Structures are given as structure tokens and as C-alpha cells.
């Protein structure tokens, strides 16, 4: 597998236009071996962290954050043991959609300021949040944390236990347009789980943490990356440079374009984090590779002591030895108790499944939605939210992150006669074209068949007759830029932009190369839609001529003519028209 250096490419100091377009040759997937990028200053890292946070939120359909509605918490079925209690929980994380879980609380009086609290997502274990084996036990970790003085909410992955209004794996191209997928719902559930803990009496809102293993660790470090309320964490057996997650709930389009889990995990810095790893899974290199990279980020904050690692000779797990390391780490950083002997795991009473399941002999509340109803509710709420936004910079940011498009500060080029090739330094892309100099306002003409077809068009003939300078390009996968692109890797769109999103980028790159504030953008045929969205996200006004040919922004229009995941959630056609002045 091709190793990605510095996340993407290492080019010579003197940047040159590459011979091949890296978007066709360097195609990462969940099993690619990534190499962490080095950051020299805290400011450089903080800028990257801000960008990644918005990218993650956009990929999850949470940019902007949906309006939070009342959780209507139902807490019932209390079980009391000698020093802790367990209760069943249902909370309404979206109108008509319910997340199930169990709430574990200490029976001793709350200290001044309240108990610290922990959200406890689970991995892909057979019994979900009720898994209790030597390899992993969610009840054991929750009960022992409660005994140590934490309030713990162990909640379901989508499609597990009591959270059954969607399957665990769902969605397709239409849902992708609206950024509605298992990761979206699960991520949102995690945010609302923190809201739930904050709302409880006796909880210290300033001391909330998270821990989970495997898929639960993915939820843990993603939540910590975007929610600063997570003050301490222990993602177990997941942060890796060689495997990024194999389940739908860990992947969404755009989530890891130009990034990967080590960088996302480092976003926890400088808050305390324990990295648990094992020789028998994809975290086998943690002591020598992933941990040093993340510790280097902590060192930028002068907080290298806030991140630790435990590496076991074991298979994929969250076993007792790992859990005890987590108890000790949390004890030292949260409880102020550095005595490891205080954090030995004690045996637990295993409750009957029916005594733990919120929906045992119980139905979902009235008004609970079907899957189709939930998707319709998501779409309706997204439309209402985005249509109310009139701030142009907010809309432009939303569309830019859906497209993952940027206006390059520098564009390099090489020319031979009227043939030109453009590229963004250190990105490895290529934009071939035809450049005909002239006088007056420059024009960029984009045709779906490429530059040669544009050269023969009436639009270009008219421009040349007027003596104007004209650039015609082979946008990504058009004209001479057509090339094999292997899309067979796992979760292709999680790691790679779609062809249409790349075409928008090529248009922006070309406009930036022209360096003409009044350059006109002309889109022919299907390329008119590409040009509309490029003009919409450009940081300056772009005169646009584009006959959209009946494109109205319906879902089917995007599926047929402009497939970009998340584009509808980001405001879609109406936002683009507003920004482009069409």
C-alpha cells in the first residue's frame, strides 16, 4: 500500500507541476498507512485544528450545529446495589428519535461541585452496551467508575439494544446529499448524551469525560475533537495510522479527506488522554508511531505529560487490565488521586438483560418516527435552518466545507505554446488547459468535454473575436484529464472528493491563476452547475454566465448531474444562487 507522506505529498522545495494528477494516483482508503504531519508551532497546529473541526462537523451534517430540542429524558427501572445504582434511560435526541442507555450513579452523597461524569459509547460487540466478556465489559467499567465516584451514561450505537429506529448500517447517495448517515446520527447522539449528563443534578459540568473501545473509541475521539466539554478521555484500541475504522458508523463522506485518525485524535490536546493499544490489532505500532506523533502535539502546549499510553500483548479488547489503566489515569487527572492501588477493578453483579433494556415490555413513546420519517424530519429541519441564514460568509463556509474547496494562495504553471497546466503547490493536482492571451477582461470557459470542446464553442469564438484573453480548462476527469481512478477502496468518499467536487476546485484554481479581479466565468452545458458552485464559494465576486439547463436543486438533479455529499445540508442550490448572484 502506498504510504502517504505528510498526509499527502512531499514535493521539492521548488514546486513543479506534477506529471500525473495525484487525485488519480494517490487514493487513500481505510487501510492506507498514513504518516503524521509535523507541526512546528502551536499557531500552525491551532489553525489546522480549527479547519479540521469544521471539516468533521460538516461531514457529520453538523455545520451549522442543528437546533437542540428538549431531550424529554425518561429515567426509570432503578436498581440499587450497595454503592451504586443503575437506571434505564430514553432521551429524544431528535424530534421523534430516541437514544437508549443505562445511567450508573454512585450512592454516596455528591461532593461539592458534583460528581465528575463519563459518557461511555460501546464498540461493535454482540451485546452492545450490555457486553460482558473477558475481552470487553461495558457494565464492569461503568459500575467500577460509579463506585469510584463518577456518573456514567452508557448509551447505544445506532441499531443496537434500545436504539432501533434505524439499522446500524443505512443510507445511500440520496441520504449522503443531506449528510444523513450512521455517523451523523451516532455523533449527534454523543453530543446529546453530554447534554443529558450536564442536565442531571449532582453532576459537575466542568468534569465530563469519555471512554470507549473500538467503534466506541472512534466515537470518543470524534466527540472530543469537536466538543470541548470533554475534559478527559480514554479511547481504547482504535487510534491508528494503518486502519481508520471499518464500519459505516465510523465513516462519512469527506470525514478523512487529507486527514486521518491520528491527527483527529490529537485534537484532544491539551486535555488529558490515555491511549490504550494492543499488539494484536491495528494499534500494534502505537508506542513507536501514533503515540509520539500525538505527544508532539501535546508538547506544543507544554502539556506532554497529559497524554499517556498503555500497550498490551493482547488481541483487540477493552479488558480488565486496560480498564484499570483507565481508572488510574482518570483518578490521577480527575479525582486528584495518584495511588494506583485505589483503582483495582472489583467484581460486579451482572443484571438480567430485561432489567437493563429500556424497551423490555415497553414500546417507544408516541410519535416515534420510522426511518423514512426520521430522514424526512432531518431534511425538513436542515432546509428550515439553512434557509434562515442570510450571512454570506456563513453560507460560503458551509458550501466550501461540503465541497472541500479552497482559493489557493499560489498557483504554479507550465506552458508550451497555447497549452498550459496549472497546479496547487504541494497538492499534486493538474489542471490542463488552453490559454489564449488578449486584452480586456479575461474569461474562464469550462465545458463538460474539456478545453478542446470549449475552444470550438460559440462562446469562445465571440470572446476571441473581441480580442479578450481566454482560458479553457480540462476540469477533473474531462478532456485530456480523463484518467483511470480506482474507486474500489473501502469508504472511497470518506477519503477522496468526488469528481464534481474536484471540478469545482479546478475552476477555483484557474480563477486564482488568472489573477484578474474581473475575470468572467462561463459554464457550458453540464459545466454550468460546476461554475455556479465555484462562483458561490469564491472569496470575491465572479461575473458568471451559466445556463443551468433545468437544474433546480432537486435531489435527483444532484444525483444525475452534480454529486457532492453534504451539498444539500450545506444549503445547496439556493445558497449557491444567493452567493453567486444568480
Where are these regions (language model features)?
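Alpha/beta-hydrolase-fold serine-hydrolase catalytic core, especially in secreted/extracellular enzymes
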Residues: 16-98, 276-441, 449-469, 476-517, ...
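Generic beta-strand/beta-sheet core signal
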Residues: 104-106, 121-122, 155, 211-213, ...
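Loop/turn elements at helix/coil->beta-strand transitions in domains of secreted/extracellular proteins
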Residues: 114-117, 148-151, 204-207, 228-232, ...
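Catalytic-domain carbohydrate-binding cleft regions of carbohydrate-active enzymes
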Residues: 207-250, 254, 258-301, 306, ...
Amino acid at each position: 500500500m502506498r504510504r502517504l507522506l505528510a498526509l499527502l505529498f512531499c514535493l521539492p522545495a521548488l514546486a513543479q507541476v506534477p506529471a500525473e494528477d495525484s487525485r488519480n494516483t494517490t487514493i487513500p482508503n481505510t487501510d492506507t498507512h498514513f504518516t503524521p504531519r509535523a507541526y512546528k508551532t502551536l499557531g500552525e497546529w491551532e489553525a489546522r485544528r480549527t479547519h479540521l473541526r469544521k471539516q468533521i462537523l460538516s461531514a457529520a451534517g453538523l455545520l451549522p450545529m442543528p437546533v437542540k430540542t428538549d431531550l424529554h429524558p425518561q429515567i426509570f427501572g432503578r436498581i440499587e446495589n450497595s454503592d451504586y445504582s443503575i437506571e434505564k434511560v430514553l432521551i429524544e435526541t431528535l424530534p421523534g428519535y430516541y437514544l437508549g442507555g443505562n445511567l450508573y450513579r454512585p450512592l454516596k452523597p455528591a461532593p461539592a461541585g458534583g460528581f465528575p461524569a463519563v459518557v461511555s459509547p460501546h464498540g461493535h460487540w454482540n451485546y452492545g452496551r450490555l457486553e460482558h466478556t473477558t475481552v470487553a465489559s461495558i457494565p464492569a467499567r461503568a459500575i467500577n467508575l460509579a463506585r469510584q465516584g463518577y456518573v456514567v451514561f452508557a448509551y447505544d450505537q445506532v441499531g443496537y439494544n434500545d436504539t432501533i429506529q434505524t439499522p446500524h448500517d443505512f443510507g445511500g447517495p440520496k441520504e449522503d446529499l443531506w449528510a444523513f448517515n450512521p455517523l451523523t446520527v451516532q455523533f449527534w447522539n454523543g453530543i446529546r448524551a453530554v447534554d443529558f449528563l450536564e442536565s442531571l443534578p449532582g453532576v459537575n459540568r466542568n468534569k465530563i469525560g469519555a471512554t470507549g473501545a473500538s467503534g466506541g473509541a472512534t466515537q470518543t475521539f470524534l466527540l472530543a475533537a469537536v466538543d470541548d466539554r470533554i475534559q478527559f478521555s480514554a479511547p481504547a484500541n482504535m487510534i491508528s495510522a494503518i486502519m481508520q475504522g471499518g464500519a459505516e458508523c465510523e465513516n462519512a463522506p469527506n470525514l478523512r479527506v487529507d486527514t486521518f485518525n491520528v491527527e483527529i485524535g490529537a485534537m484532544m490536546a491539551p486535555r488529558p488522554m490515555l491511549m490504550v493499544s494492543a499488539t494484536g490489532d491495528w494499534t500494534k505500532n502505537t508506542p513507536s508511531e501514533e503515540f509520539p506523533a500525538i505527544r508532539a502535539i501535546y508538547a506544543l502546549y507544554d502539556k506532554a505529560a497529559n497524554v499517556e499510553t498503555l500497550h498490551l500483548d493482547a488481541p483487540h479488547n477493552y479488558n480488565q487490565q486496560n480498564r484499570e489503566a483507565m481508572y488510574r489515569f482518570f483518578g490521577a487527572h480527575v479525582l486528584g488521586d495518584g495511588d494506583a492501588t485505589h483503582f483495582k477493578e472489583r467484581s460486579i453483579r451482572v443484571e438480567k438483560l430485561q432489567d437493563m433494556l429500556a424497551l423490555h415490555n415497553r414500546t417507544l413513546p408516541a410519535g416515534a418516527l420510522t426511518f423514512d420519517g426520521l430522514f424526512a424530519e432531518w431534511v425538513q429541519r436542515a432546509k428550515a435552518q439553512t434557509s434562515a441564514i442570510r450571512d454570506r460568509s456563513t453560507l460560503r463556509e458551509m458550501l466550501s466545507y461540503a465541497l472541500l474547496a479552497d482559493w489557493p494562495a499560489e498557483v504554479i504553471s507550465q506552458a508550451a505554446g497555447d497549452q498550459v497546466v496549472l497546479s496547487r503547490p504541494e497538492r499534486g493536482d493538474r489542471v490542463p488547459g488552453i490559454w489564449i492571451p488578449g486584452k480586456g477582461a479575461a474569461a474562464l470557459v469550462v465545458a463538460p468535454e474539456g478545453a478542446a470542446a470549449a475552444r470550438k464553442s460559440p462562446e469562445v469564438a465571440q470572446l476571441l473575436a473581441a480580442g479578450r484573453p481566454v482560458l479553457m480548462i480540462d476540469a477533473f476527469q474531462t478532456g485530456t484529464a480523463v484518467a483511470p481512478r480506482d474507486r474500489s477502496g473501502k469508504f472511497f468518499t470518506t477519503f477522496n472528493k468526488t469528481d464534481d467536487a474536484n471540478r469545482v476546485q479546478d475552476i477555483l484554481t484557474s480563477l486564482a491563476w488568472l489573477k484578474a479581479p474581473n475575470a468572467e466565468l462561463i459554464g457550458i452545458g453540464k459545466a454550468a452547475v460546476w461554475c455556479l458552485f465555484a462562483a458561490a464559494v469564491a472569496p470575491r465576486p465572479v461575473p458568471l454566465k451559466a445556463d443551468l439547463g433545468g437544474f433546480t436543486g432537486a435531489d435527483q438533479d444532484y444525483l444525475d448531474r452534480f454529486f457532492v455529499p453534504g451539498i444539500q445540508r450545506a444549503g445547496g442550490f439556493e445558497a449557491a444562487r444567493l452567493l453567486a448572484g444568480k
